[in-house]
């Protein structure tokens, strides 16, 4: 089944003794059903044009398509030159046609009516292209409709015979248009929006759906490589080239970039869970750099070297004892033989350096530790408004970058913006 949905303008049903766009589509596509849309002003007319209600639309259409079913819709449009005025109305009518005739092919007349109507139908096609076709009809002289002789209702029967005679000797002026450039422009903007939100998988799916996309193969390759790197926590090739032979810096910088990406796109719970682990790794590098041999490794696990400094060992034991006052449990050197983590590193630096930039930033990470444990281990939901949790998480993410720069001062500021630079490179290919 074929259905034609057609707005009607002042150049319908004919002009200069030749078909208007709607009638020409009916003539050459022979639809089973035609839905005509009139604004009330077009239907009623004004001092310049007699209203379209004066024409016998059923008789005109059935003169060239005898068994065609015709439905007329007339609506009051308050602001006819508003591009949004027809969006919901046209969509509603087309949804109704699809629901009543699910297997029908719907032709959209994008030549008749106002520019606002034509654009709305083009957008409808771009958004919901399934089983729809946009039909454009050129003028007989392939020029505009300026200075044309409009149809007159009072002599429509005679004029219709003349029009049918003229058109019987002429080829079709209909053209199916895919509006690929229009559709691609919308898709490109959607992809750019996804890139701005770091939603690379959705961007890749959208690019893959556009077979004729300019630079599509290259864009898909770059997105796929980045997605795999993020999923597998592989260091970006850019970072490897930028900092060769410094694997620890590469890893710390990669995870800091990913942490900031997750925070910026709103993955707050994921950010909260990861921030302490990344901070722990960075602080471990700081201690190795500034206090060599304080940490020893057993099967790649970090332990406190109690032989590093008797003063530090005694101070650390005293600190542990002060925290165990309620249990009266005394710590011994043997009890310090356990895997180290962020809390222990924080204690060491507070004992060794008192207050400095590193310990201050560590405190910001430590401030969200209880919240992190509730989310990560108790599977609690996250309330950003309670106890200023949102601000505390932001402060912790910022602290990780500051800590990284304290350990690896050679890192450049623009390295943190690698993903934004990647996004821009994809946008340029688009």
Curated annotation (Swiss-Prot):
It comes from Enterococcus italicus (strain DSM 15952 / CCUG 50447 / LMG 22039 / TP 1.5). CRISPR (clustered regularly interspaced short palindromic repeat) is an adaptive immune system that provides protection against mobile genetic elements (viruses, transposable elements and conjugative plasmids). CRISPR clusters contain spacers, sequences complementary to antecedent mobile elements, and target invading nucleic acids. CRISPR clusters are transcribed and processed into CRISPR RNA (crRNA). Belongs to the CRISPR-associated Csm6 family. Transmembrane segments: none annotated. This is CRISPR system endoribonuclease Csm6. It is an enzyme of class 3 (hydrolase). Homodimer; the composite ssRNase active site is formed at the dimer interface. Residues 156-430 are annotated as: HEPN domain. GO terms for molecular function: endonuclease activity. The keyword Hydrolase applies. NCBIfam families: cas_csm6. Its EC number is 3.1.-.-. It holds the Pfam family Cas_Csm6_6H. Keywords: Antiviral defense, Endonuclease, Hydrolase, Nuclease. Non-specific ssRNase activity is allosterically activated by cyclic hexaadenylate (cA6) binding to its CARF domain. cA6 is a second messenger produced by Cas10 of the ternary Csm effector complex in the presence of a cognate target RNA. Encoded in a type III-A CRISPR locus.
């Amino acid at each position: 089944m074929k259905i034609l949905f057609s707005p009607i303008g002042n150049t319908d049903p004919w002009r200069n003794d030749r078909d208007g766009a709607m009638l020409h589509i009916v003539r050459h596509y022979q639809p089973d059903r035609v839905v005509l849309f009139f604004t009330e002003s077009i239907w009623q007319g004004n001092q310049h044009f007699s209203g379209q209600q004066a024409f016998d639309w059923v008789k005109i259409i059935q003169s060239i398509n005898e068994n065609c079913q015709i439905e007329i819709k007339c609506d009051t449009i308050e602001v006819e030159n508003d591009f949004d005025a027809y969006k919901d109305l046209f969509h509603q009518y087309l949804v109704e046609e699809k629901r009543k005739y699910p297997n029908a092919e719907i032709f959209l007349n994008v030549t008749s009516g106002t520019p606002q109507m034509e654009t709305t139908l083009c957008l409808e096609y771009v958004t919901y292209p399934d089983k729809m076709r946009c039909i454009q009809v050129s003028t007989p002289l392939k020029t505009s409709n300026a200075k044309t002789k409009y149809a007159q209702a009072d002599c429509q029967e005679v004029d219709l015979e003349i029009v049918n005679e003229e058109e019987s000797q002429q080829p079709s002026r209909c053209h199916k248009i895919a509006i690929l450039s229009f559709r691609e422009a919308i898709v490109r903007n959607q992809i750019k929006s996804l890139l701005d939100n770091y939603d690379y998988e959705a961007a890749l799916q959208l690019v893959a759906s556009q077979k004729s996309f300019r630079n599509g193969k290259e864009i898909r390759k770059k997105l796929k490589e980045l997605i795999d790197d993020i999923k597998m926590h592989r260091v970006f090739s850019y970072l490897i080239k930028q900092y060769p032979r410094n694997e620890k810096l590469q890893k710390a910088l990669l995870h800091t970039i990913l942490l900031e990406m997750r925070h910026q796109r709103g993955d707050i719970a994921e950010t909260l869970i990861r921030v302490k682990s990344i901070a722990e790794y960075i602080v471990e590098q700081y201690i190795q750099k500034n206090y060599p041999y304080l940490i020893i490794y057993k099967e790649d696990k970090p332990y406190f070297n109690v032989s590093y400094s008797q003063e530090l060992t005694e101070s650390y034991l005293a600190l542990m004892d002060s925290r165990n006052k309620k249990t009266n449990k005394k710590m011994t050197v043997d009890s310090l033989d356990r895997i180290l983590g962020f809390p222990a590193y924080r204690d060491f630096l507070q004992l060794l350096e008192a207050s400095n930039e590193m310990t201050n930033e560590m405190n910001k990470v430590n401030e969200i530790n209880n919240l992190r444990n509730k989310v990560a281990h108790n599977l609690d939901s996250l309330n950003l408004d309670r106890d200023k949790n949102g601000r505390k998480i932001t402060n912790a993410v910022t602290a990780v970058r500051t800590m990284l720069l304290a350990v690896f001062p050679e890192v450049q500021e623009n390295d943190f913006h690698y993903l934004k630079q990647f996004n821009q490179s994809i946008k340029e290919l688009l």
